[in-house]
Amino acid sequence: SMEKFHPRSFNMGFSQEVLKATGGFSGLRFGEDIDMSIRIMAAGFKTCLLPEAYVFHKRRTSFRKFFKQVYNSGMARINLYLLHPHSLKLVHFLPACFVIGCLLCLLGGIFFSWYCLLPLLLLIFVFFIDSWRLNKSIKVAFLSIVAAFIQLFAYGIGFIHAVFAALILK
């Protein structure tokens, strides 16, 4: 079944009634929008996506800023789990598995056989071809590889960091 839509703060609108019933945004620095969405639904209100609504929000201007944003999202997922245990799904673990898988491929390539690098090379090839097909630009295709790895690594590392900090070493 499809998950319920959780609006994000950059495009979220709600009534004064919802604001009063939920108490508004929590003090979370990251993940505050998902926390608010969960509390809205827990208070008995419905959420929906309005595909015709036009929303503009500022994109990150560098890969460094993008990494930081996505890293914080990975950490926020564990903080959300602590507040709302039912909100953590299997899909949230995938970037962490990607990080571990990449490290195992690299270590295998260094210490065993270059064949261990084949899964990474295949993934890079798939990212490149898919982006090139969609965007018709070799430059964008190469940047897509970088962006995809940054997104997956940043979220995965943030998630792993939060698991250790909040759950294992607490």
List each language-model region with its residue ranges.
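Membrane-embedded multi-pass helical conduit in multi-pass membrane proteins
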Residues: 98-169
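Catalytic donor/gating beta->alpha subdomain of glycosyltransferases that bind UDP-sugars
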Residues: 26-88
